[in-house]
């Protein structure tokens, strides 16, 4: 071409890998267009400050450095293109390209050259590699001599690149002469500070609009100086430094803690920040609720009156969490979520609970549930398949608590444990008002049915030992036990404690057969029944009392859920395990019963309900015989 050179199949290297396109070098500068359009890079010749040629595998690379510190790399030139393009650039731009050599020795020690926003690692005088500091998301000082750089890897993944540089670590010994330190500030710290000062050149190099010092952050844990810039948020700690673009801020949450002088401010991110191998989609900041600040923004009046009109004010005075949230909302444009209509029994905004092994608080919000502080877990209502209330066994140490299971449409489950029972009605009413599907005890239930079941549980929990004492005094010990077992259908487990399920979540109340339950009831109730006799009698009276307690073999008996399951599955167990010992059949049945599907448990419960009605009628007739009816029945039989 008379007015320049045109090259096809030239790739632009940088963030997101390489992008193929077309490059045109003309008298006014350089223009590169991506294949398919949408993206173009134009460099005016007046902005060029340096040009380099480098031999790379199978082609040549042209490097263009501009005044802003940016460095563009165009790859795909043939050997014969180098000479013609060099002479053209000399005549039109007045810059002679410099030839650089690539180190192929494989050595991993050398020197670092920091120029503009580029970090170049040199082995001797040859370049081993270079990275753009504009892509550095954060820096970490590991120990006294290692500095790790982590890159904006999520942006790379958005470009659908299978392989990308995520982090790189430099070892800076104390004997380093390029970055001289002292006892309090080793060379690695000097190198990290230099990187941090250069990583913000260009569009992100503006001064902080406002800085909040010494803020406690629970996730990722530490104390940080929080800097709010025009285009990004910065968390600067003693060992970690995070730079977060406002485009990554999805939503802000302002959530007061119940009965404590602190308030959570949560910054939800997409993509999340990364520390080592851990991702942090939520930054949890904790402010003192009553702390008042007076802040002035370092921002020009032109920006305040144009871009940030009705979004920011020149000065703010108020509670620190309110001031921080308002400024961050104005800069990022993210929406703020506050507590909704839910109130706990203590008029708070959350209920205490545990998630996995961590204690925290669960916030029922208008469109989501949020568990804080660790691990911060956000569950949107639209992602929920159903919720389930799970009670703890009556009479146990945890009888005053219940669990809340939230199952997502992706089949993932979140179990919030040890919620106080007096929070049930508030939670149930709130969840019902949101139209969320509620399941209880492993089966679909209507709202009123669930309420009735849980109310029964509450009644049972008032004084369960009183009913046991009454039944034992009446000589019918097994009746109350079977009724109690029906209420605990979902806590039912294997017929023996050797089933291997002792570590499951329901091990406190389940994984035991009815005879196993009878033993502690006898031990617990035996001293209570003869308590008054002990004052007037002796040990012989207690022995006589125990000898009198004999069961009538003709008394009606109820059938447990495990017995129903055993009747239907015993033959299948024998078929699946030929030659299995008789003592092992019960263990296998117990394992299968614990792992049986929701539908099968529902069928078992239906059979239990039917059997309970039968048992209730028979035991009523057994306890209250009617002589006339019995005589007439005998007459008819004899006849």
Swiss-Prot record:
Its main location: nucleus. Gene3D superfamilies: 2.30.29.150, High mobility group box domain, Pleckstrin-homology domain (PH domain)/Phosphotyrosine-binding domain (PTB), Structure-specific recognition protein (SSRP1). One of its GO terms (biological process) is DNA replication. The keyword Heme does not apply. One of its GO terms (cellular component) is FACT complex. One of its GO terms (molecular function) is DNA binding. InterPro entries: HMG_box_dom (IPR009071), HMG_box_dom_sf (IPR036910), PH-like_dom_sf (IPR011993), RTT106/SPT16-like_middle_dom (IPR013719), RTT106/SSRP1_HistChap/FACT (IPR050454), SSRP1-like_PH1 (IPR048993), SSRP1/POB3 (IPR000969), SSRP1/POB3_N (IPR035417). Residues 474-506 have a biased composition (Acidic residues). Transmembrane segments: none annotated. Pfam families: HMG_box, PH1_SSRP1-like, POB3_N, Rttp106-like_middle, SSrecog. It is found in: Nucleus; Chromosome. Residues 555-623 bind DNA. Residues 469-559, 612-639 are annotated as: Disordered. Keywords: Chromosome, DNA damage, DNA repair, DNA replication, DNA-binding, Nucleus, Transcription, Transcription regulation. The keyword Flavoprotein does not apply. Residues 618-639 have a biased composition (Polar residues). Belongs to the SSRP1 family. Component of the FACT complex, a general chromatin factor that acts to reorganize nucleosomes. The FACT complex is involved in multiple processes that require DNA as a template such as mRNA elongation, DNA replication and DNA repair. During transcription elongation the FACT complex acts as a histone chaperone that both destabilizes and restores nucleosomal structure. PANTHER family: FACT COMPLEX SUBUNIT SSRP1. Component of the FACT complex, a stable heterodimer of SPT16 and SSRP1. This is FACT complex subunit SSRP1. The gene is SSRP1.
């Amino acid at each position: 071409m008379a007015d320049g050179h045109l090259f096809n199949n030239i790739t632009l290297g940088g963030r997101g890998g390489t992008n193929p396109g077309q490059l045109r070098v003309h008298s006014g500068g350089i223009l590169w267009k991506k294949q398919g359009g949408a993206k173009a890079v134009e460099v005016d010749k007046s902005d060029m400050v340096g040009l380099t040629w480098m031999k790379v595998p199978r082609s040549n690379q042209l490097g263009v450095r501009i005044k802003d510190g940016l460095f563009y790399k165009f790859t795909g030139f043939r050997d014969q293109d180098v000479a013609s393009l060099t002479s053209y650039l000399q005549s039109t731009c007045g810059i002679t390209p410099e030839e650089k050599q690539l180190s192929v020795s494989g050595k991993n020690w050398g020197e670092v050259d920091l120029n503009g926003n580029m970090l170049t690692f040199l082995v001797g005088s040859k370049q081993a590699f270079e990275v753009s500091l504009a892509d550095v998301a954060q820096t970490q000082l590991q120990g006294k001599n290692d500095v790790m750089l982590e890159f904006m890897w999520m942006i790379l993944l958005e470009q659908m690149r299978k392989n990308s540089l995520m982090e790189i670590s430099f070892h800076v010994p104390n004997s380093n002469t390029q970055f001289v330190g002292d006892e309090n500030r080793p060379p690695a710290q000097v190198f990290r500070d230099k990187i941090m000062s250069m990583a913000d050149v260009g569009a992100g190099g503006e001064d902080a609009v406002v800085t909040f010092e010494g803020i406690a952050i629970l996730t990722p844990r530490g104390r940080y100086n929080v800097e709010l810039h025009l285009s990004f948020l910065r968390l600067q700690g003693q060992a970690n430094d995070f730079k977060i673009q406002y485009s990554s801020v999805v939503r802000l949450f302002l959530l007061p803690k119940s009965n404590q002088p602190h308030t959570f401010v949560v910054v939800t991110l997409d993509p999340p920040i990364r520390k080592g191998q851990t991702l942090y989609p939520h930054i949890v900041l904790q402010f003192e609720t009553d702390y008042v600040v007076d802040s002035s923004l370092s921002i020009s009046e032109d920006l305040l009156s144009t871009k940030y009109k009705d979004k920011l004010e020149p000065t703010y005075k108020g509670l620190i969490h309110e001031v921080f949230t308002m400024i961050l909302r104005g800069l990022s444009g993210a929406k703020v979520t506050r507590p909704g209509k839910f109130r706990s029994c203590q008029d708070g905004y959350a209920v205490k609970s545990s998630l996995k092994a961590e204690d925290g608080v669960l916030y029922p919000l208008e469109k989501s549930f949020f568990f804080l502080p660790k691990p911060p877990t956000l569950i949107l209502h639209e992602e929920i398949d159903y919720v389930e209330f799970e009670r703890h066994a009556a009479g146990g140490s945890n009888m005053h608590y219940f669990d809340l299971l939230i199952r997502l449409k992706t089949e993932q489950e979140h179990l919030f444990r040890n919620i106080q029972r007096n929070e049930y009605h508030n939670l149930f009413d709130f969840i019902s008002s949101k139209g969320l599907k509620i399941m209880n005890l492993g089966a679909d239930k209507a709202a009123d049915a669930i309420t009735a079941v849980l109310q029964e549980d509450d009644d049972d929990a008032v004084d369960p030992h009183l009913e046991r004492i009454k039944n034992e005094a009446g000589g019918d010990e097994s009746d109350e036990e079977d009724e109690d077992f029906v209420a605990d259908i979902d806590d039912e487990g294997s017929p023996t404690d050797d089933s291997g399920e002792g570590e499951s979540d329901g091990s406190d109340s389940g994984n035991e057969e009815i005879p196993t339950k009878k033993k502690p009831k006898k031990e617990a109730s035996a001293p209570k029944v003869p308590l008054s006799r002990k004052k007037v009698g002796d040990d012989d009276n207690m022995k006589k009392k125990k000898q009198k307690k004999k069961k009538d073999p003709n008394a009606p008996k109820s059938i447990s859920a495990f017995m129903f399951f055993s009747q239907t599955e015993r033959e299948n167990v024998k078929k699946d395990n030929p030659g299995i010992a008789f003592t092992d059949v019960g263990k296998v049945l117990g394992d299968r019963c614990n792992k049986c599907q929701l539908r099968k448990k529902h069928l078992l419960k239906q059979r239990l309900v039917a059997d309970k009605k039968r048992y209730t009628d028979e035991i009523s007739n057994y306890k209250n015989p009617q002589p006339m009816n019995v005589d007439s029945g005998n007459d008819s039989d004899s006849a």
